[in-house]
């Protein structure tokens, strides 16, 4: 009799675990590309706060055309992106080639690396997280209020 009770409890717990896992998987895949739309200001790179001297670093997503535009610190950048279920890849990138303050050039070099390594994206409220293939945070951006 006790064995039957234990087995029933185990079945309930197993069902509960399956439901939780399913809900977790569905919610992680539910991000819509439209959440990326608009201008995002770069706030941190590899958990280090970003402060530019001359121009604010930003990325602007045009989700209808699959294009991005932005400033990585000094230079303007244009390119395309693909998005599928939280996976994000930048491509066909082109940028101007100006020099600027050393601090801004360092931010720009870091952002070029971030864009190259980005494989996943997550939006949490007004914060966008760019992540590598393992889910490690590369950069965080805040939605512009303009």
Predicted feature residues:
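Sec-dependent bacterial lipoprotein signal peptides
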Residues: 1-27
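Lipid interaction determinants
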Residues: 27-146
């Amino acid at each position: 009799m006790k064995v039957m009770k234990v087995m029933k409890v185990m079945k309930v717990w197993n069902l509960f675990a399956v439901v939780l896992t399913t809900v977790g998987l569905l919610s992680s895949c539910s991000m819509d590309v439209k959440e990326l739309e608009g201008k995002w200001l770069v706030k941190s790179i590899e958990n280090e706060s970003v402060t530019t001297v001359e121009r604010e670093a930003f990325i602007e997503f045009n989700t209808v055309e699959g294009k991005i535009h932005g400033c990585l610190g000094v230079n303007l950048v244009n390119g395309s992106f693909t998005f599928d279920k939280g996976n994000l890849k930048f491509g066909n990138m082109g940028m101007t080639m100006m020099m600027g303050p050393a601090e801004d050039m360092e931010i720009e070099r870091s952002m070029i690396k971030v864009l190259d390594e980005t494989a996943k994206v997550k939006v949490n409220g007004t914060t966008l997280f760019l992540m590598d293939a393992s889910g490690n945070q590369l950069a965080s951006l805040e939605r512009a209020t303009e």
